[in-house]
């Protein structure tokens, strides 16, 4: 496996040109410590052999990690006492360290700021609902997509995250739910959305490895159904097509935000590389391959993309491909510090939804959890609080 951070795709220069980010460039400034979640089975067995441990100990470690969310030596009760610390240090180096934890919505929304091995900061958001618990996770440090209304997009891309760094966000949240650390008592982490910091398709190899580990049953993974995992993208077409070939029934979410190329060029710089037709073609092909409805994410911005003409054009573009293949999630824009972009008027939000519904498009206005702790969509900026 050895899924250490690979290359990504990021805007380059002021002309809108794009380039691949090489591993020696700023997207990979150093490798995190190799973690159990980064290793192939052969690498795990090899590491165990170096420690003088028999092969069957690897399966025991997998059961501890994926089945019980344990990484601490004292929890390895089935290991010889003298070997527990060695095993924990070799297989489970600390990849993410909690810096701050902010709580909102009566304790049912928790935003955590994490420090990585190199001092980089990322965030994840855990949201408990009556019938499910969703974790929004990061896949890159920062983001190179440059969307002007998104706090993460203003950071630029520092580097890709390893599979281990991604998976650890899930393990810690799953353990917190099991241990009753979230308001509502003990429960189960049920849904994962790759909608935190970063463009998941720009870190494809690590994200795919994480998806496999999240969705596989213990002791190979956490056992969260692939159907409850959402992978988002601003429209990196090669990534969408590659994901369709994997045969993993995750939901695809496309951050469209505009129905025309003229407007989307301004809101989503990646549109200069992959235009709306290319993105929607790929998204529809993903629907055909996966039999999963695609989510179309659409941040509503006052006077920019929230008028009747925009809703009508969006409906026309989606209906071009047929019925019931996409579900639109209009999202009230979440404010970010110093931004000129503001949320739509409630009456414009209602009219936008009504037009989509009348055109036969399924659409649901997105619940904006964690806005008061800058934990909602587009607000993750990984800042330490004063």
UniProtKB/Swiss-Prot annotation:
It is found in: Cytoplasm. GO terms for biological process: rRNA base methylation; tRNA methylation. Keywords: 4Fe-4S, Cytoplasm, Disulfide bond, Iron, Iron-sulfur, Metal-binding, Methyltransferase, rRNA processing, S-adenosyl-L-methionine, Transferase, tRNA processing. Residues 129-372 form the Radical SAM core domain. Its cofactor is [4Fe-4S] cluster. The active site is at 123 (proton acceptor), 377 (s-methylcysteine intermediate). Disulfide bonds join 136-377. It is an enzyme of class 2 (transferase). Its EC number is 2.1.1.192. Binds 1 [4Fe-4S] cluster. The cluster is coordinated with 3 cysteines and an exchangeable S-adenosyl-L-methionine. PROSITE patterns: RADICAL_SAM. S-adenosyl-L-methionine binds at residues 198-199, 232, 255-257, 334. It catalyses: adenosine(2503) in 23S rRNA + 2 reduced [2Fe-2S]-[ferredoxin] + 2 S-adenosyl-L-methionine = 2-methyladenosine(2503) in 23S rRNA + 5'-deoxyadenosine + L-methionine + 2 oxidized [2Fe-2S]-[ferredoxin] + S-adenosyl-L-homocysteine; adenosine(37) in tRNA + 2 reduced [2Fe-2S]-[ferredoxin] + 2 S-adenosyl-L-methionine = 2-methyladenosine(37) in tRNA + 5'-deoxyadenosine + L-methionine + 2 oxidized [2Fe-2S]-[ferredoxin] + S-adenosyl-L-homocysteine. [4Fe-4S] cluster binds at residues 143, 147, 150. The keyword tRNA processing applies. Its main location: cytoplasm. GO terms for cellular component: cytoplasm. SUPFAM superfamilies: Radical SAM enzymes. The keyword tRNA processing applies. GO terms for molecular function: 4 iron, 4 sulfur cluster binding; metal ion binding; rRNA (adenine(2503)-C2-)-methyltransferase activity; rRNA binding; tRNA (adenine(37)-C2)-methyltransferase activity; tRNA binding. NCBIfam families: rRNA_mod_RlmN. HAMAP family: RNA_methyltr_RlmN. Reaction proceeds by a ping-pong mechanism involving intermediate methylation of a conserved cysteine residue. Specifically methylates position 2 of adenine 2503 in 23S rRNA and position 2 of adenine 37 in tRNAs. Belongs to the radical SAM superfamily. RlmN family. This is Probable dual-specificity RNA methyltransferase RlmN. The lineage of its organism: Bacteria, Bacillati, Actinomycetota, Actinomycetes, Bifidobacteriales.
């Amino acid at each position: 496996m050895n899924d250490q951070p690979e290359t990504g795709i990021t805007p380059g220069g002021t002309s809108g040109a794009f380039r691949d980010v090489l591993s020696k460039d700023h997207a990979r400034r150093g490798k995190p410590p190799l973690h159990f979640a980064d290793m192939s089975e052969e690498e795990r067995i090899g590491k165990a052999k170096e420690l003088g441990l028999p092969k069957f100990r690897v399966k025991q470690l997998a059961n501890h990690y994926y089945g019980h969310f344990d990484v601490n030596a004292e929890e390895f009760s089935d290991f010889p006492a003298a070997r527990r610390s060695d095993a924990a240090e070799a297989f489970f180096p600390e990849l993410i360290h909690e810096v701050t934890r902010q709580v909102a919505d009566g304790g049912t929304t928790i935003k955590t700021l994490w420090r990585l091995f190199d001092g980089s900061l990322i965030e994840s958001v855990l949201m408990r609902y009556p019938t499910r618990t969703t974790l929004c996770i990061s896949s890159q440090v920062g983001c190179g997509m440059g969307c002007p209304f998104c706090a993460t997009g203003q950071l630029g891309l520092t580097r890709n995250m390893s599979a281990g760094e991604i998976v650890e966000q899930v393990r810690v949240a799953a353990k917190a739910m099991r241990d009753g650390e979230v308001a509502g008592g003990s429960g189960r982490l049920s849904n994962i959305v790759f909608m935190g910091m970063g463009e998941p398709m720009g870190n494809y190899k690590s994200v795919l490895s994480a998806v496999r580990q999240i969705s596989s049953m213990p002791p190979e993974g956490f056992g969260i159904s692939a159907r409850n995992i959402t992978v988002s993208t601003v429209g990196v077409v090669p990534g969408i097509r590659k994901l369709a070939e994997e045969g993993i029934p995750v939901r695809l979410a496309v951050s469209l935000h505009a129905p025309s190329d003229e407007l989307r060029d301004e809101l989503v710089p990646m549109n200069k590389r992959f235009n709306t037709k290319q993105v929607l073609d790929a998204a529809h092909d993903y629907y055909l391959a996966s039999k999963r409805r695609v989510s179309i994410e659409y941040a509503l911005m006052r006077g920019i993309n929230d008028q009747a003409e925009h809703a009508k054009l969006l409906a026309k573009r989606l209906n071009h491909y047929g019925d019931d293949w996409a579900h639109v999630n209009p999202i009230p824009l979440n404010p970010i510090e110093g931004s000129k972009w503001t949320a739509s008027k409630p009456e414009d939000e209602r009219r936008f939804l009504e037009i989509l519904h009348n055109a036969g498009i399924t659409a649901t206005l997105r619940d904006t959890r964690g806005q008061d702790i800058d934990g909602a969509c587009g607000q993750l900026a990984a800042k330490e609080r004063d």
